Amino acid sequence: MDESSRIASSSALHGLDEMVSAHKPSPPLPSRRKGKSALRSALEKKNRKSKSKPKVTITSDTPKVSSQHSPVSSAYTGDSTTDLDSKSGHSSSQKLSNKVSSALKLTIPKRWRSSKSSSSQCSSPFLPTSSSNGHGDDASLNLPDKKSRPSSQSSIFLSNWSTIFSSNASPTDSQLSPTHTSTIAELAASTLSIFPSGSYAGSTFGSPSRSSIDSSTYLPRSKSVNSLSSNFSARTPASNQSSVSEDFGAAPNCDHKHNSVTLSDFALPDIDQHDTVETILEKVEFTIPKQFTPAILSQGTSSLLKLCLRKYLSVVNFKCISLDMALRKFLAVYVLPNETQQIDRVLSTFSDQYFHCNPDLYDSSDECYILTFSLMILHTDFFNIHNRQKMTRAEFISNTNLPTILPEILECFYDNITYTPFVHVEHIGCVVTSPSNEKPSLSQRLGDSQFRLTKRNTFATESDHQALQEQLTGFRINLDSILDLKKIDSVRTSIESPTRTADDLYKEFARAPFLQIVSHRSQPQAFSYHFEPSAESESTNPAIINVKVFKLGILIQNEKVRKDRLLSNREVGVILTSSQLMFFKNVYWISGLLDQLEDFKRSHSFSPCYFSPHLTSLSADYIIPLSDLVAYGDGSRIENELYSFSVKQKNQRTHVFSVTNVDELNDWLVKINFVSTFATAGLAPRERLPCVESSDKSIKASVSVLPDIYEDSDAMSKASKETRSEVLECSKVRVYIVQNRIYKLEEALRQGESKMTVQRRNAANILHLEPIQSRTRIRLARCSNTLKKNMLAQMIEIQKFKISIKFLKEDLEMDSHLQDYLRSVFPSSVMGKENASEDTILESNFRNHSNPSVRRSNLRVGKTVESVQNTKLKSVENDSGKAETETVGKNPEVVRKSPAKLPNIANIMTVNGHRYSVVELPDDFLRE
């Protein structure tokens, strides 16, 4: 402390001591000298200790003062008359001292108190003077010592007193008047003028926040039960308040109670018949405040005002905001009308604008409207103090009744709405910042009801739209890593583009190698597609069964031994046949077969490849059926430079395999899915027909697979007329089966894509949600994990349906070419009847079809299809009297005349003593 400050402090304390002593009877001189010396020693000790905090004492004798001189004092001390008893006077003064001390936030040590009076000639206009009778009450402020008080306030307080008592101070005329009487309340009020004070204007909900100035400055709150600062600050001069308002950046006149306006103060301007949407909006924006504009525009029922309301709200940006937070943002700026119909118009327009900004979150604007209205009803129900039975979470989900939205999303809406009420921000000149970024004061941490730590309203006083936008999106959690939509979209059943066609795959299957199995207990024709035992066909020769191998190789299987361990990789041999995947742990045997196949390819031989030696049995370690099987992958490379793909069974069990290059990966995917498509439909991939002139005792002619004897193109022309006609009818049956399967797959694909669209909307909704409570975030994280699994399974099914439809349509196109081929082989005289009925197509009402498994069994054993035919014609018997032509299904190009009979396929497979499957092809049909 410098010399000037020391002199000022000494003079201030000296004057204070003289003023105090002027109101007390003079005690003996030794005691008076002792008090002065103690005061001086205390001041010198204070100056020597620079780290100690300066403290001030106030000791005065309060006379009997009329209430008209001190209204504040009379308000807090009760009656203006005081008791002459020293105890009662000291008690009343003690109560007043405690109240004043809480307002001043100061402490006074005992050693600075003095009960000695000095000469009555020493008086000050700033302290109360004695009455005419010379007696008064002792009003010493006996306060506890607080060592934790900041030194900045004490320094300011001390410097202010030094200024008051310095010779340079210029008191007012009223203060210099000898008849002016000051009280302790007035002294406290004049002392509090050094602290900043200001009025607030903010929200209708919540508590006022502190200003964004230095947090060390004390700002008294209004209506505080802990201090009297709000009452004393009211006596601060207007000039002082104006300066404080300027320091806080607020307007001088920002009293919310005096400047508030309501919706009833405004009305819809007059509208002429020549007014347009633009002119009406100009009138409304010129005469009506922004927060009341939607409510005013909703008062009219004309379509023109609805367009005005829609255009006015079209500038509001709701992109990437959840619906509940968008509703908060909307109600923070705009005021809803009072009538129900008008509220309905405003909320309907809000829903349209929200759906326009976020078309991927909901199915339609009507869905947004239902949710918005449900949220408003929930808010009204929950925060209504007269409603004892609050709406529960389960009741809210049940009342909303939107099955396409996940319950976890509705639960998040419920938690956010019930956590804190909606807030409307008044648009006035006061600039108030949010308290969320400031450290709470001591009174806030001690449990002030206006500043709760557990449920603090962060939307209460936010008037800046940009900051409000940041607050509304500050609770969003990152669920992208859990959902991982990119991985879901990368699921493919074929890596190459474009995928190989069915014609290309048929050519590869026609040249596929064979495994030969020798059986001594079976007849040669036992493994034919349609076998009827006869005495003539019995033979003692062993039967050789040819098993076509569509694909074989060595794969790395990835499997988990235990849940807590990493993947274990092991090599397995895999053989793909027409009906199953066969796995062998003996990879050396598979490696030998691969070597034989490579040698055969280098020989450029046109005959089929037969693996040697012949097998007495074919026992795989485990088998996976191809029915309802799908193979998929994403083409991504995993560790050790491998490409992985998965095979998913009908029972949802998944097997993961790895290959060394992407070409091998794509080859496995395409061939597995191709064979699985026909195995699921109850068909087999087409093969070449055996020679019709071969002997029945030929081993290779006894099986339905491709032998090493090629078909002669002239063989068909030698067949009888009835046989040729039956072959064409057989082809029609296959067309019917394939068409039926395509129709069912397309229906399943539409349903799967619809479910996938709903799941994508739910995923986007979860990513945009902003849960406030931690328990809501935990539920959303669990829901995201479950949703990811469902979306992945649905995407796999969609890809399976797509590739199956592709292969079946290509096979259907091949059937039409096959019929043309057969007609070209048969003589024209034989095909005359067929040509006459060429315009008659097979009736295909796919919805009323018989059991597929029963139908497949009937076709394979050669039974008649009368039951199938009756089932097919049952739905069209009632329509026989209708028009000749009608549209089939949803395709207007497919027209049928009279219901055509299904072909009778009994015994139609016999051609020169040979029985063939409906899935076989002539040899020269597959072009080289």
Swiss-Prot record:
Q: Composition bias, kind Polar residues: at what positions?
A: 1-12, 57-83, 234-245
Query: Where does the record place Low complexity bias?
Result: 89-102, 115-132
**Which residues are annotated as modified residue Phosphoserine in the UniProt record?**
S67
Q: Does the keyword Ribosomal protein apply?
A: no
Q: Which UniProt keywords apply?
A: Cytoplasm, Guanine-nucleotide releasing factor, Phosphoprotein
Annotated SEC7 domain ranges read 228-420
The Gene Ontology biological process terms listed for this entry are: exocytosis; intracellular protein transport; regulation of ARF protein signal transduction
Main localization (coarse): cytoplasm
Q: Which GO terms describe its cellular component?
A: cell division site; cell tip; cytosol
Among InterPro entries, the record links this protein to: PH-like_dom_sf, PH_domain, Sec7_C_sf, Sec7_dom, Sec7_dom_sf
Which residue stretches belong to region Disordered? 1-152, 227-249
What does this protein do, in the record's words? Guanine nucleotide exchange factor for Arf GTPases, stimulating the nucleotide exchange from the GDP-bound to the GTP-bound form. Involved in vesicular transport.
Q: Which PANTHER family match?
A: GUANYL-NUCLEOTIDE EXCHANGE FACTOR, PROTEIN MON2 HOMOLOG
This protein is called Arf guanine nucleotide exchange factor sec74
- Please give the organism: Schizosaccharomyces pombe (strain 972 / ATCC 24843) (Fission yeast)
Starting at the broadest rank, the lineage of the source organism is:
Eukaryota, Fungi, Dikarya, Ascomycota, Taphrinomycotina
Q: What gene is it encoded by?
A: sec74
